[in-house]
């Protein structure tokens, strides 16, 4: 059953050094605030999982939190590369980063398999792809019914999944809407799950076909309005396109990046203080 906790307490209690951690969101509802708190608390040796790692993963990797990344595509969407990710892979800064690359269909199916308690996922998606040449975990299996040769990949079962959502009720049930990726599957596949939300209400009033995660599947719910910034939360906040553009020069240089992390994450007590400091800096320009 989910507890209503501060984000600080949830990360302290449920994220451990050496864990496999998935921070999932697709286009919107990206759990940036939780990623910042992981950096702030100095968690390390993490295996990070994400279908489309973007800015928060660049920050986690550059801050030295990660030893491995399991992913399918990574970049600053609409802008370019993740420079801290590239520096870690190409030049081992701040230390070496192991990478395990998959296709989108592969990783989505791996989450589904994990949520179903299965050891692996099966798919057809690797016909004509070179990914099996660089990822030895992509295997071939023969269908016992048709004889067709298929691809098989290990299921993804994170120690901790972290997502951002629009609403939770006081019992810890969570409601998401808008564009969804694999948040539901990632949450159900994990041993523990932290959800940051825009608001906590008495009654979810979930519309038909909405995605509702039950309290029994979650570990903690944290009230963090705006916690998906710079991505958006459908119905609550807009995407901060300027931040995505501004991140590119910050991340390109090690000293500039380190100064930004020290000022805006280590130099703030929580995400509310981070947002206030960011707003003041923006107004001063």
Label every model-predicted segment:
Residues 1-285:
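Conserved alpha/beta enzyme-core scaffold
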């Amino acid at each position: 059953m989910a507890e209503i906790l501060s984000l600080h307490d949830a990360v302290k209690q449920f994220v451990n050094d050496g864990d496999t951690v998935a921070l999932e969101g697709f286009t919107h509802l990206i759990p940036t605030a939780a990623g910042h708190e992981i950096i702030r608390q100095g968690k390390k040796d993490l295996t990070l999982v994400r279908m489309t790692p973007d800015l928060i993963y660049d920050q986690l990797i550059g801050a030295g939190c990660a030893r491995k990344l399991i992913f399918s595509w990574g970049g600053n969407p609409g802008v370019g590369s993740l420079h801290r990710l590239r520096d870690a892979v190409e030049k081992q800064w701040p230390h070496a980063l192991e990478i395990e690359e998959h296709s989108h269909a592969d990783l989505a199916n791996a989450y589904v398999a994990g949520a179903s308690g299965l050891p692996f996922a099966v798919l057809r998606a690797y016909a004509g792809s070179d990914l099996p040449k660089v990822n030895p975990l992509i295997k071939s299996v023969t269908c016992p019914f048709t004889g067709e040769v298929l691809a098989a990949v290990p299921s993804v079962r994170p120690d901790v999944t972290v997502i951002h959502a629009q609403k939770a009720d006081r019992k810890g049930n969570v409601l998401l809407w808008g564009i969804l990726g694999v948040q539901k599957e990632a949450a159900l596949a994990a041993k523990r799950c932290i959800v940051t939300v825009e608001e906590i209400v008495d009654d979810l009033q979930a519309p038909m076909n909405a995605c509702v995660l039950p309290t029994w599947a979650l570990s903690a719910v944290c009230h963090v309005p705006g916690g998906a910034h710079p991505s958006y939360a459908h119905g609550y906040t807009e995407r901060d396109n300027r931040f995505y553009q501004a991140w590119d020069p910050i991340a390109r240089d090690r000293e500039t990046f380190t100064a930004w992390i020290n000022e805006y994450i280590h130099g703030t007590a929580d995400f509310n203080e981070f947002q206030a400091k960011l707003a003041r800096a923006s107004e001063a320009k």
